[in-house]
């Protein structure tokens, strides 16, 4: 017996049960599964019922920890059974209830459920007398229901099946509610009735900040607007002073639409904010323009913040107030839209093009106007009335409705959709930075006086936004070049353009910048005045043909239309600040830009797409323009 003292309990039991003499009784080794009183096998064999069901006790109770209780009865000792007949029975026992063995394995890893189990055994009125080792071990063969529920809950929260979003293959939905939810995200979008608090300028790229700083930026923006907007829930409690670095990241606040009840529409294409009273579109942020979304701190749990860019506010943090615990549902829906769009992008990158084109062609009135599908602009990015630096000519609210990518739909609210985290990042933005870019344009920036050199890397590299910011180099840069020449034909201006420098400051254009540009353009032979998109494309015959026109539907928006590789390209030339620029250079005027690229045989490149300027299409070749002049 002592030679086998080092063997495990399982090996010892199998040795005794299979090869021991029928007349020998072996004293079981002490185990922490047993009761405090070490009981011999002869005492255990004289015990009463085993378990709650009163099943007969096996002749060898030492096998109970390793075999199911209902199958642990061995043949009688009067008729010894050969070993070959026991092996199939043991195999069937092992395969009959493998969950029992897994439960025993969990108990062997130092859990604290055994004392609790013994306490429940002692309080169980169905048990007879003190709990024997067989009773406690047979009950441990099946894990207690509280433990199973706890483990099952954690597994559901961590497994990929718990996420309702489809994987790389075919979507696997667990309920009709999940299917209905995904259909809304892929189609018209999910609608929530929230309160718009305003937005705060973000002067640095979120990609230049680490994860912790991004969260601090959004929470500081929430705190600022809660203090500025009357009646905000988060303005009552005192908050800690902001971190010093936040003053260089956050800029001015725009409270034009603050406190307004809006309908928030979340889809895989965009986030749209619509005024519930007059159905006016406050903001329409394409999903590519959203980089970060987060909830508030413990004092502002009813708020959701997301960082997006648009031509009016440039990069800004928009704050939404969600009542009745809806904030978690809103942030979860945004995160699911991020993930679902990213998975669609991985399967088929061309879906971005189709999704963006659907936003423009919404109704029959879309054919009556020009669709602004410039390759450096996202469809539907027409800025609304107002904003921090809006110099555009104001548009009527009825015209703005044409840019709405949604239609009126019944407001819906999903109270049970709070499975995901409260902070989300747009993965599609990082994948485009690697090289899978979509030819849609140039990034904008409003104020660069506080802009650091580190965040200049992504300036005009994100193919999502109109080139709406005018940057001018500091005096003395670019070889002390002269200022813009307001008079004379710019075709004969041969000076080099100003190079965009890190730390450059923007000088606001005068209020007469747009009329002044229009006056200059009329002296150019390639300027055709107001011209629709289709009419401009009809004048482009061969590669290298280009012309300059004014948008027929957006006054003050000047477009360079060119033909490259048999495909028409449309590039916005003048930003709302009145500056003419490309990704790397600032030009005095449109003629200076054209002359520079023609003389140096340089194409205009934006987000992987280029337009070569070889031969201008003169206004004499436009019969419609000649007829209007007569």
Curated annotation (Swiss-Prot):
It comes from the Eukaryota. Residues 39-80, 118-150, 471-514 are annotated as: Disordered. It is found in: Postsynaptic cell membrane. Residues 1-185 are annotated as: CH2. SUPFAM superfamilies: PH domain-like, SH2 domain. Residues 370-525 are annotated as: CH1. The keyword Chloroplast does not apply. Residues 125-142 have a biased composition (Low complexity). Residues 471-486, 502-513 have a biased composition (Polar residues). Residues 186-369 form the PID domain. InterPro entries: CEP152/SHC-Transforming, PH-like_dom_sf, PID_Shc-like, PTB/PI_dom, SH2, SH2_dom_sf, SHC_SH2. The keyword Phosphoprotein applies. Residues 526-617 form the SH2 domain. Only expressed in melanomas. Weakly expressed in normal melanocytes and benign nevi. Highly expressed at the transition from radial growth phase to vertical growth phase and metastatic melanomas, when tumor cells acquire migratory competence and invasive potential. GO terms for molecular function: protein domain specific binding; receptor tyrosine kinase binding. Activates both Ras-dependent and Ras-independent migratory pathways in melanomas. Contributes to the early phases of agrin-induced tyrosine phosphorylation of CHRNB1. Interacts (via PID domain) with phosphorylated MUSK (via NPXY motif); undergoes tyrosine phosphorylation downstream of activated MUSK. Interacts with GRB2; the interaction is dependent of Tyr-424 phosphorylation and increased by EGF. This is SHC-transforming protein 4. It comes from Homo sapiens. The lineage of its organism: Eukaryota, Metazoa, Chordata, Craniata, Vertebrata.
